[in-house]
Amino acid sequence: MRTKLSLIAFAFALSGQYCTAQTNEPVNDWKPASSNQQGKQYPQVNSEGRVKFRIVAPKAQSVGVSFRDSSAFTKGEDGAWVGYTRPLDEGFHYYTINIDGGEVPDPNSQFFYGSSRWGSAVEVPAKDADFYSLKNVPHGHLREIHYFAKSSNTNRHCFVYTPPDYDQDTTKHYPVLYLQHGAGEDETGWGRQGCAGLILDNLIAEGKTKPFIIAMEFGGNPFGGPRPTNTAPATTGGTNSTFAGPGGRAFTFSAFEKVLIDDFIPFIDGNFRTIADQPHRAMAGLSMGGMQTRSLTLAHLDKFSHIGVFSGGSIAVTNITDMAAFKEKVKLVFVSYGSRELGTNRVAGRGFGGDPKANVAALKAAGINSVFYESPDTAHEWQSWRRSLREFAPLLFKD
């Protein structure tokens, strides 16, 4: 009798395990990702935020994907390998395909520049995606431009967003936001994965922000200066342009600073109908671009009146060497993070200026217009920064 009961109990245990395994199967409501190349059916995304891949590699011995905790890929009779991710955060994610130990882009995905190379990415639909969706509203232009920088004796490449009415009313002049990408990315980032143009188009159409120009340059180190090291000390910003990020990685901003101040701003003012003064000029950036913004705006209060730091540190009261001048010249300090970044080593790391919430509160107490924004349920990723731009833009250039 005991043996029978044991067998029954064992059968129930197996049944429970089987049911659990079944409930972990992906929900079968797959749709092609919006980030796919034209006509490609994979990758696909379901309502759980899981991503399904199908890679045709009939001679491969193994296939996988760079997302952690993904399922093992299985090979079908047609030579195609299929695998799934865990549920991912809403928004944009870079990835690579691994075939027999070699990392390659997914031939089904559009290509985006990230991790210092062109590669694949997938868009997981977000509940709040409406603010960066393509709608039937007037659209601005995202212009790809080459220009020559005398300070570095180099040809430069940039993108400039002009608002929908820019070409209709040729007597109107506009403020400018200088918007910087993160480490491992380039000047294409905000226009492509960041959806900056669509965000501004929609905000302008809804009457939530004044029209302004966005100028996007490469913030890396393209002409032979020192590369990132592990030895540079943290600084408090201001005129010293070497800044230590998480893990002691040092970023040297002096080369970009010279191009920005001596070449890029004069080029934009000389070739677009800008309001070419400090009250109508802003700077913002994500991650490394936020660190650049923090450092360079503190060093050039005569150039920028609005400051946006997205996941790139914050400004402490002790960073401000001339409080009277700062109060007079700076109209806004905006700091943002994804909620899943806060309290992590990325925020607490050297050179990030301390607790961002506390720093914003201290700036407010000192009489400086300061805003802290926390993107819900996101980490150090593009969904945090898209939302940050949405929150930042309506605060700019108020009379």
PLM-predicted stretches and their roles:
Residues C19-T23:
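Boundary at the C-terminal end of the N-terminal hydrophobic targeting segment
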Residues P26-S35, G39-S71, G76-D399:
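Non-catalytic cap/lid and distal C-terminal segments of serine-dependent acyl enzymes
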Residues S6-Q17:
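Bacterial N-terminal signal peptides
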